[in-house]
Curated annotation (Swiss-Prot):
Name under which the protein is recorded: Clitocypin-5
Pfam family for this entry, one: Inhibitor_I48
Biological source species: Clitocybe nebularis (Clouded agaric)
Upper classification of the organism: Eukaryota, Fungi, Dikarya, Basidiomycota, Agaricomycotina
Keywords: Protease inhibitor, Thiol protease inhibitor
Complexes and interactors: Homodimer.
Amino acid sequence: MASLEDGTYRLRAVTTSNPDPGVGGEYATVEGARQPVKAEPSTPPFFERQIWQVTRNSDGQSTIKYQGLNAPFEYGFSYDQLEQNAPVIAGDPKEYILQLVPSTTDVYIIRAPIQRVGVDVEVGVQGNNLVYKFFPVDGSGGDRPAWRFTRE
């Protein structure tokens, strides 16, 4: 399985069944420290708050950190709790597993490396918030949220 190279990216919300939906879309957007990460269009005033640094760690997991201008301290994809539909928070960066979606080169499922009996915990969108979604580990459960990583 190909791994994502370290670098700066914009993260567009897509799905495993439709990894290339065409023009437009919503992108992971920081609102501020300790605030939920939003899904917003890639237009002003959101555009400058959609740049993320992805760094792969020695254990094969990755951190996704906000790379915007004038950030007073380091924050990235994080969580207070990993419950169904709990928001992704811009906080102390946590580690995630990035799983390449088959038949794509730049679309990944973002999975929290947390052991839950029978489920994978994945980053998706509900309304305009990034949230944690639970899916059966056996691959059932239908279409899954995924993210197109576009290099900056």
